[in-house]
UniProtKB/Swiss-Prot annotation:
<feature type="active site" description="Amidino-cysteine intermediate">
    <location>
        <position position="406"/>
    </location>
</feature>
<keyword id="KW-0496">Mitochondrion</keyword>
<keyword id="KW-0472">Membrane</keyword>
<dbReference type="InterPro" id="IPR033195">
    <property type="entry name" value="AmidinoTrfase"/>
</dbReference>
<dbReference type="GO" id="GO:0015068">
    <property type="term" value="F:glycine amidinotransferase activity"/>
</dbReference>
<comment type="pathway">
    <text>Amine and polyamine biosynthesis; creatine biosynthesis; creatine from L-arginine and glycine: step 1/2.</text>
</comment>
<dbReference type="GO" id="GO:0006601">
    <property type="term" value="P:creatine biosynthetic process"/>
</dbReference>
<feature type="active site">
    <location>
        <position position="302"/>
    </location>
</feature>
<feature type="active site">
    <location>
        <position position="253"/>
    </location>
</feature>
<keyword id="KW-0809">Transit peptide</keyword>
<dbReference type="GO" id="GO:0005758">
    <property type="term" value="C:mitochondrial intermembrane space"/>
</dbReference>
<protein>
    <recommendedName>
        <fullName>Glycine amidinotransferase, mitochondrial</fullName>
        <ecNumber>2.1.4.1</ecNumber>
    </recommendedName>
</protein>
<keyword id="KW-0999">Mitochondrion inner membrane</keyword>
<comment type="function">
    <text>Catalyzes the biosynthesis of guanidinoacetate, the immediate precursor of creatine. Creatine plays a vital role in energy metabolism in muscle tissues. May play a role in embryonic and central nervous system development.</text>
</comment>
<dbReference type="GO" id="GO:0005743">
    <property type="term" value="C:mitochondrial inner membrane"/>
</dbReference>
<comment type="similarity">
    <text>Belongs to the amidinotransferase family.</text>
</comment>
<comment type="subunit">
    <text>Homodimer.</text>
</comment>
Length: 422
């Protein structure tokens, strides 16, 4: 039987301390203001913000950002944009994360926009997805449109951009904190700029905002001689713990982490290194525990099409990429569900992902799931679990590298911090 432990006051440790600190800060601020009413205007001029710009300290109920897991009732979400999406240059880290049959595509179109007609269809699909989310009672927010074709240069590399299609890759909400991930692809170095207006708004309304150490993305971060030839090579390398990213500096994509209350699960992948995982462990302890899990996966990148937690003690586990630690979950009383084989046809382009985007679903709450309208077999699987399916077709959007979970970051879910993994 699954054991659940509710933590009083919501998020214990870090968030409780934050709230107590806020109350103490207010009291101290009041005393100081009374003591300094006669102070000079020159001292006031040294304040970093004017009176109308002061950032408020919210109560837990007022904070616009709060999510503890992947299944509590969804109230607000960021949905990405396909507009202006560009093919990333064919660098070593891109090669390691893509399938060989698409390498000629990257070699030909790297630095250019994705096929225009395909992107237009993806844009229309995501707009419809947003409309359906709003119909389901969810507030939808979007990143800013950006011209990703512009070339940029740092002291260590030059590149063009990619897109702001997958907010799950760059933003992770833990409690009332937004964490910006230090992603590993050079083409995504400035992706955060599309989200900054939203993040600043949430911050001004009381959310906590953390940017993980920005990687230099110097050559030392990548194994320039990473030996990629066949899928068998990839299996061997992954089994040996060898990846295209080194331990030169911390890097991670937020989509390699998945939340279950006080327990957060992560994989070491082509874009997430152990330094990045350790940074998250130190940053989130002691309230949260980070568990490293691994899979029989020749191309590990993002956990949510391999291991997707859809409810308290309920997880979808990809049969093609079995979890090496699955007994750990069974012993904790979890139910492990094997999703059916995807139905997406072989001739549909998936430039950055596999067909298993069928299991990359978005839970609207414990009893509602957003699922691909074309994937009838997984719809039946959810219905057998007593979960209502909200069907949307995003096949052309899938081609850009993500399913519903990838295309979103949940900003606010109604619930409390609990332990599901005792």
């Amino acid at each position: 039987m699954l054991r659940v432990r509710c933590l009083r006051g919501g998020s214990r440790g870090a968030e409780a301390a934050h709230l107590i600190g806020a109350l103490v800060g207010r009291a101290l601020s009041g005393r100081l203001s009374r003591a300094s009413r006669s102070s000079s205007s020159s001292a006031a001029a040294q304040l970093p913000l004017s009176a109308h710009e002061q950032v408020p300290e919210p109560t837990a109920e007022e904070c616009p950002v709060c999510a503890h897991n992947e299944w509590d009732p969804l109230e607000e979400v960021i949905v990405g944009r396909a507009e202006n999406a560009c093919v990333p240059p064919f660098t070593v880290e891109v090669k390691a994360n893509t399938y060989e049959k698409y390498w000629p595509f990257y070699q030909q179109y790297g630095g250019q926009t994705f096929p225009k007609e395909h992107v237009q269809k993806a844009v229309a699909e995501i707009e419809e997805m947003c409309n359906i989310l709003q119909h389901e009672g969810v507030t939808v927010r979007r990143p800013e449109p950006v011209d990703w074709s512009l070339e940029y240069r740092t002291p260590d590399f030059s590149s063009t951009g990619m897109y702001a299609a997958m907010p799950r890759d760059i933003l992770m909400v833990v409690g009332n904190e937004i964490i910006e991930a230090p992603m590993a692809w050079r083409a995504r170095f400035f992706e955060y700029r599309a989200y900054r207006p939203l993040i600043k708004e949430y911050f001004r309304r009381g959310a906590r905002w953390t940017t993980a150490p920005k990687p230099t993305m110097a050559d030392q971060l990548y194994d320039q001689d990473y030996p990629i030839r066949t899928v068998e090579d990839r299996h061997k390398l992954a089994a040996q713990g060898k990846f295209v990213t080194t331990e030169f500096e911390p890097c991670f994509d937020a989509a390699d982490f998945i939340r279950a209350g006080t327990d957060i699960f992560v994989q070491r992948s082509q874009v997430t290194n152990y330094m990045g995982i350790e940074w998250m462990r130190r940053h989130l302890s002691p309230t949260y525990k980070i568990h490293i899990i691994s899979f029989k996966d020749p191309n590990p990148m993002h956990i949510d099409a391999t291991f997707n937690i859809i409810g308290p003690g309920l997880v979808l586990s990809n049969p093609d990429r079995p979890c090496r630690q699955i007994e750990m979950f069974k012993k904790a009383g979890w139910t492990v569900v094997t999703p059916p084989t995807p139905l997406i046809p072989d001739n549909h382009p998936l430039w950055m992902s596999s067909k298993w985007l069928s299991m990359n679903v978005l839970m609207l709450d414990e009893k509602r799931v957003m699922v691909d309208a074309n994937e009838s077999t997984i719809q039946k699987m959810f219905e057998s679990l007593g979960i209502k399916t909200v069907k949307v077709s995003i096949r052309h959007a899938n081609s850009l590298g993500g399913g519903f979970h990838c295309w979103t970051t949940d900003v606010r879910r109604r619930g409390t911090l609990q332990s599901y993994f005792l």
